[in-house]
Amino acid sequence: NEAINHEMIEYCPAASEAVACSIAAGLKMAGKKPIVIIQSSGLTNMGSCITSFLKPYGVTFPILTSWRTYKEGDSEIQHKHLASELPKLINAYGYKYHFLDSQNIDNAINQINNSDKTHTICIIKKDSFDKVNLKTKHQLLLLLKATMLLLGC
């Protein structure tokens, strides 16, 4: 929410992680500086884009993923597997990974900048950030954009 609230950042919601990956690749090739931020379960949705487009053609941009942990009774069973195997999945895609520094913001920014030049995914550990509420004006804008996407506009 902090990034969405920031006036200097243009937030672009996507229907899926694979779509976000494709949009970011296009932006990168157009000379922009995209960042894709996803939940760990969404990394599986990006697999084909990563292995058939980004990696073979050398397209790089920062990808940040949470590391969602599995809890007994979780409604989505894939979280159990990803809770223990996320680094292996990243390596299987031909990427490296590192854990985003949650103690030193300058180091975290350097890690993100470095992942813009390499096939590296930054893993964000649970509770790395403070909770930030989304500003009301952005809540309405996101609702409008989501509605337009659903209607095919």
Where in this protein do the model-derived segments appear?
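Thiamine diphosphate
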Residues: N1-C153
